Amino acid sequence: VPYVLVASISKSNIDQSIVAFFSFSLVASAGYIFNDALDKSADQKHKSKKNRPIALGIIKLSTAYYMAFILILCGISLSLMLNKYFSFSLIIYGILSYTYSFWLKRYAYIDLFILGLCYLMRLIAGYLVIDLQAPSPLLAIAFTFFISLASLKRYIEMSDNSLKNQKIERRGYKFQDSRKVLFIGLTTGFILPAFFLFETSIFELKWFLLLILMALGNLWYRAYKKNLDDDPLYSFLTDRFSYITIGIGLCLKIYS
C-alpha cells in the first residue's frame, strides 16, 4: 500500500521493504501454523480444511510447533536489520496473532476486532520500515475494511448448512449468528468508509477507497450467493473482477 500511495521510493527503501516482507512473512507463517495445530480436530471435520498437512497428520503437532518457533526466531532476527520501530510493530503483531490463535478466537465478535488489528499492524509496519507516517484517515479506512474482511471469513463459515443449530468448534459463533456478522461486515466495510469520501483532506485516497469498496462489494455478493471459497483472499486473487479493479487502480496511479 505505501508504494501505491507514496510519490517516490528510493532504492534503499525497496531493499528494506524486501527484508521487512520476509521478516513479517516468517512471523505470520508461524501464526498460521499455530492456528492449524490448535484447530486440528476441527479442521479434520471441515470439508476443505481437512486436506491441510497438519489435519491429515502429514506433519506432527510437535514438528509443527518446532517449525513455528524457528520461523519466529528467523523473522525477529531479520527485523533487527531494520529500524527499531518496525521491529516493535512486528513484536506487537506477533503477540496479537498468537494470542488470537491460542485464546481470543473463542470469543465472538472480539475475534473480528483482533483480526482487524492484526491486518492493520501489517499496514503500519509497511510505513514504518520506510520511515513514513501512515495517514490517519487511511488507517481508519483500513481498519474498518479489515474487520469487514474478517467478518466475511466468519460469515462464509456460518453459511454452511451442515452447521445449522450447532456451535462452530473453537469459535464463539452459532449458525444463527450469520445475520449479525453480515450486518457488522457490511457496516464496517461500506457505511463507515463511505463517510471518508466526503473528507477533502484525503482527496488523493478517494480513488483508492472506491476501488477497495468495489472489490469488497464483489466478495460480499459472492459470499451471500454462496459462491466464494473459504479463504476470501484466495477468492480475491483468483477473481477476474479483482484483476480489473487492480488494473484500473494502476492506470489511475500512473496517469495521476
Language model features by range: what are they?
Residues V1, F21-S29, Y66-S77, M81, ...:
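Generic alpha-helical transmembrane segments of integral inner-membrane proteins
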Residues V1-N13, S101-S136:
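Long, highly hydrophobic alpha-helical transmembrane signal-anchor segments
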Residues T63-K105, F190-L219:
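Transmembrane helix-loop-helix
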